[in-house]
Amino acid sequence: MIFNEEHKSQPITKLQVNDAFKKIRANKGSAGVDGITIETVSSNPRKYLYPLWNRMTSGSYFPKPVRQVLIPKGNGKMRPLGIPTVLDRVAQQVIATELENDVDKHFSPNSFGYRPNKSAHQAIEQCRINCMKSSWVIDLDIKGFFDNIDHELLLKSVAHYTQKKHILLYVKRWTEAAVELPDGTIKHPQGKGTPQGGVISPVLANIFMDIVFDKWISKRNPDNSFERYADDIIVHCKNIKEALRLLEAIKERFRTCKLELNREKTKIVYCRRNQKRQPPFKVRYQKFDFLGYTFKPRMEMKGGKMRMGFSPAISQKSVSRITVELFKMKVHRWVHFPLSKIAALLRLKIRGWLNYYGVFRKSEMRRLFKVLNQRLVKWVRNKYKRFKRKHWYYALKHLKGIAKSYPNMFEHWKYEGFRPC
């Protein structure tokens, strides 16, 4: 039977499905409950993508259960991660792309997460500027945001922006998709939570928060600037009274929308920018974390003089996370590789750290690269017998000599302050 796109009930083209698969293939990822991998689909796209397009255009597409795996968090706890099937990810990408094209132009300029031409660095820079203008910050932490978005309110939010029936149909089906737990049992959603691990979850979260928070605060408190990256939100206030009142209003707004703030992590912070000027009273918090950076009072060079500012730099939490990653890699045991090979293997990872955490106060990354250099010193001692029984200083001296002769070998060695010392 020959299918004609013009006669399909849902306006989805084969090109949309093919383009969506290209994006999914580029992002890689493992198989879902059906065991079908990206490589399997790539080897015979017509066998898999054509039936998917056929089902999506006829309205007969239903997602398979999402495979759940447990990922360790930095605090020792486990975080559930959902893995939809490859074909379900393709279907979600089709709708996510179309939905994003329709709604993104309506979003707040203060929303930075998972949007075209927006980035975390833009959010951090705007936050830095606003911290210089306003003395107080509300650091909001939503308890289990992605797991607690109410389905009814979410579907109403999507319907506010689009009346396309195929989008509303499939968003509803994805929210109702079952989850296969690690022990093999099937769990059905209880009317809340975005599609686990789904590529459509970010745009759905942005639609939901645009109505729940962005539009609400812009209308209610137009003078209070803010930055939002998905569920990470910073609100700026002129004084403590304004911050306290606004925080209570936000709590009530979230309660109305079936969200809850984390009491332990939500806090009001004083942005101290003057070394001589003390807070008007005893302040509990004078720093906060946002998108992997810590904002706090720091001495800065301004106009040829050292003055206090309130600026971002890589957070201790980020340093600790990367340090754990370095220890797990066991670089000091890679004695079967020459140092140049180790540098090549680590190049993209180190470059990624520098590109993200080195945008603001790059010098603060020194403590991170000190750990990496210590791993390399240990590698020298393990690699060469002549250093095993000697004091570690001699291995360090050897590594310093290599760094001096080949400063471009490791990405971080290109910066003098990050070399072995």
Model segments located where?
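A conserved non-catalytic segment of reverse transcriptases
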Residues: R173-E176, K258-V335, R351
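Non-catalytic, polymerase-adjacent accessory regions of viral genome-replication enzymes
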Residues: M1-K47
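Non-catalytic, peripheral interaction segments enriched in hydrophobic/basic residues
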Residues: I342-F387
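Conserved polymerase palm-domain catalytic core
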Residues: R55-L70, G74, P109-S111, R115-K118, ...
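Core structural elements
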Residues: P65-V66, T175, V179-E180, F337-N355
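Extended C-terminal regions of large enzymes
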Residues: L372-R375, V380, Y384-C421
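Short, solvent-exposed helix-loop connector elements
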Residues: Q190-T194, G309-S311, K328-I342, G352-M365
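Amphipathic alpha-helical blocks
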Residues: S30, T40-P65
